[in-house]
Amino acid sequence: MIEIQTVGTVQVLTLSSGRVNAQDVELLKELTGALGELQRSGAGALVVTGAGRAFSAGVDLNRVVEGGAGYTDRLIPALSEAFEAMFCYPGPTVAAI
Protein backbone atom coordinates (compact mmCIF):
# COMPACT_ATOMS: atom_id res chain seq x y z
CA MET A 1 0.00 0.00 0.00
CA ILE A 2 2.93 2.33 0.63
CA GLU A 3 5.87 2.39 -1.76
CA ILE A 4 9.06 4.28 -0.96
CA GLN A 5 11.85 4.99 -3.39
CA THR A 6 14.93 7.14 -3.19
CA VAL A 7 15.56 9.67 -5.95
CA GLY A 8 18.89 11.32 -5.29
CA THR A 9 18.61 12.63 -1.74
CA VAL A 10 14.80 12.75 -1.79
CA GLN A 11 12.44 10.06 -0.53
CA VAL A 12 9.29 9.56 -2.62
CA LEU A 13 6.42 7.98 -0.70
CA THR A 14 3.59 6.74 -2.93
CA LEU A 15 0.13 5.84 -1.67
CA SER A 16 -0.94 2.82 -3.69
CA SER A 17 -4.23 1.46 -2.41
CA GLY A 18 -7.18 0.64 -4.64
CA ARG A 19 -8.39 2.86 -7.45
CA VAL A 20 -8.22 6.19 -5.63
CA ASN A 21 -5.96 5.61 -2.61
CA ALA A 22 -8.84 5.93 -0.16
CA GLN A 23 -7.62 6.02 3.43
CA ASP A 24 -8.59 3.11 5.63
CA VAL A 25 -7.17 1.89 8.94
CA GLU A 26 -4.63 -0.37 7.25
CA LEU A 27 -3.28 2.31 4.89
CA LEU A 28 -3.07 4.87 7.69
CA LYS A 29 -1.16 2.50 9.98
CA GLU A 30 1.23 1.63 7.17
CA LEU A 31 1.71 5.34 6.41
CA THR A 32 2.46 6.08 10.07
CA GLY A 33 4.98 3.23 10.19
CA ALA A 34 6.68 4.28 6.96
CA LEU A 35 7.04 7.87 8.14
CA GLY A 36 8.51 6.67 11.43
CA GLU A 37 11.04 4.48 9.60
CA LEU A 38 12.04 7.36 7.34
CA GLN A 39 12.47 9.65 10.32
CA ARG A 40 14.58 7.12 12.23
CA SER A 41 16.78 6.57 9.16
CA GLY A 42 17.61 10.26 9.01
CA ALA A 43 15.98 10.72 5.62
CA GLY A 44 15.68 14.31 4.49
CA ALA A 45 13.26 15.74 1.97
CA LEU A 46 10.03 13.84 1.37
CA VAL A 47 7.62 13.91 -1.55
CA VAL A 48 4.22 12.28 -0.95
CA THR A 49 2.22 11.27 -4.01
CA GLY A 50 -0.51 8.88 -5.05
CA ALA A 51 -0.44 6.09 -7.61
CA GLY A 52 -3.03 6.06 -10.34
CA ARG A 53 -5.48 8.80 -11.17
CA ALA A 54 -5.89 10.29 -7.70
CA PHE A 55 -3.60 11.46 -4.92
CA SER A 56 -6.17 10.26 -2.38
CA ALA A 57 -9.94 10.33 -2.27
CA GLY A 58 -9.75 10.87 1.50
CA VAL A 59 -11.27 8.55 4.08
CA ASP A 60 -12.78 5.36 2.66
CA LEU A 61 -16.42 6.08 3.49
CA ASN A 62 -17.55 2.67 2.25
CA ARG A 63 -15.43 1.05 4.96
CA VAL A 64 -16.89 3.46 7.54
CA VAL A 65 -20.45 2.54 6.56
CA GLU A 66 -19.69 -1.19 6.43
CA GLY A 67 -17.72 -1.21 9.69
CA GLY A 68 -19.97 1.02 11.75
CA ALA A 69 -18.98 2.41 15.12
CA GLY A 70 -16.38 -0.30 15.78
CA TYR A 71 -14.50 0.59 12.63
CA THR A 72 -14.74 4.32 13.34
CA ASP A 73 -13.33 3.70 16.82
CA ARG A 74 -10.18 2.32 15.14
CA LEU A 75 -10.15 4.80 12.24
CA ILE A 76 -10.06 8.04 14.23
CA PRO A 77 -6.90 7.16 16.22
CA ALA A 78 -5.20 5.78 13.08
CA LEU A 79 -6.04 9.00 11.22
CA SER A 80 -4.77 11.13 14.09
CA GLU A 81 -1.51 9.17 14.34
CA ALA A 82 -0.91 9.42 10.57
CA PHE A 83 -1.54 13.17 10.60
CA GLU A 84 0.79 13.63 13.57
CA ALA A 85 3.52 11.56 11.88
CA MET A 86 3.20 13.66 8.72
CA PHE A 87 3.12 17.00 10.54
CA CYS A 88 6.09 16.06 12.75
CA TYR A 89 8.27 14.72 9.94
CA PRO A 90 11.51 16.70 10.38
CA GLY A 91 12.47 17.15 6.74
CA PRO A 92 10.92 19.37 4.08
CA THR A 93 7.72 17.68 2.92
CA VAL A 94 5.67 18.34 -0.19
CA ALA A 95 2.66 16.68 -1.78
CA ALA A 96 2.83 15.98 -5.51
CA ILE A 97 -0.83 15.98 -6.47
Model-flagged regions — what are they?
Residues 50-85:
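Glycine- (often His-adjacent) and acidic-residue-rich active-site loop
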Residues 49-50, 97:
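Short beta-strand/turn micro-motifs composed of small residues
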Residues 24, 72, 95-96:
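A generic secondary-structure micro-motif detector
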Residues 1-49, 84:
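Conserved CoA-thioester-binding segment of acyl-CoA-metabolizing enzymes
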Residues 83-97:
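Glycine-rich beta-to-alpha active-site loop
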